[in-house]
Amino acid sequence: MLKRLRSTHPMLYCLVAEVLFLGMLFVASLLSLLLILFVVRDIDAVDDYMLTFMQETAGVLVAWLFLARTGKGGLLRRRGSGFFNGLLVGLYPIALISYNAYNTLLFGRPEGDMLPAWHVVWFLIGMTSVGVAEEFLFRGVIAQTLLEHFGTSRAGVWKACLLSGLYFGAAHLTNLTGSAPLGVLMQCVFAASLGTLLAAVYFRTGNIWVTVFIHAAMDITSMLIGGLYGTETVADSISTYDITMLTSIAVYLIPTAFLLRKKKLSEVELYFGRDMK
């Protein structure tokens, strides 16, 4: 049924995949809390990022099931350009991540000691699991489906990138339950632009683990002080976003245009031509 829906109504298929993914995250969050309350009986003793990992593991499972049931599980093993060559393609976001991490650690560290090592480990694991789950779904399931629908022409690749970015941005509306509305709206704009760039990197490399690495590194960097020192939560961080986040449209779409310049589109055909109908 999923394979037929994907073939005949690809955009509806993408919407169904996203809704089920987000729904599973919500259910997994509730079940994790109930399990912890039953076993530990003290929710304050449990690290928030441990809960994130448990939640995102359920998301990974949903995305993998969509890939497996539609015959696309092999995407997770596809080498494409290779991981390290792919990192060169994604050098721009990696440079941004490195700069932000350096700037944060140099100028943004609060007074006081870091959290215990086990908290930091859960922070790294939790944020990495977000990157894995979201890349499996938004690039492996959604961007891949849209590319196969629109084709590997220049217009087709751009449509797949932009539309998958919009799906990615819209998913962050779920943060309205815990963060300020303006912050969430700005996060959606930021995420839509970033999702467009990550789709371009995925299409240029044919290797989903490249975007998993970039996404996880970006999430870790964005919460670096909170994760190392416990000074803020993800919800607190989102609430601080303001209209300056609109600059992300240019920050991410200009390099997207560079990655998808005409002479490089043959690489998309090389890695994904076999998937076209």
Which residues fall in each region the model found?
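Structural signal for the C-terminal ends of transmembrane alpha-helices
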Residues: 65-73, 101-104, 203, 254-264
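Membrane-interface starts of transmembrane alpha-helices
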Residues: 9, 42-58, 152-164, 207, ...
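Functionally important transmembrane alpha-helices
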Residues: 184-241
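Aromatic-anchored segments of alpha-helical transmembrane domains
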Residues: 22-29, 94-102, 165-174, 216-227
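C-terminal membrane module of polytopic membrane proteins
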Residues: 216-277
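Short, Lys/Arg-rich, polar N-terminal cytosolic tail immediately upstream
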Residues: 1-10
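Membrane-interface helix/loop boundary segments of multi-pass membrane proteins
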Residues: 136-163, 200-207
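Alpha-helical transmembrane segments in multi-pass membrane proteins
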Residues: 15-69, 83-93, 117-122, 126, ...
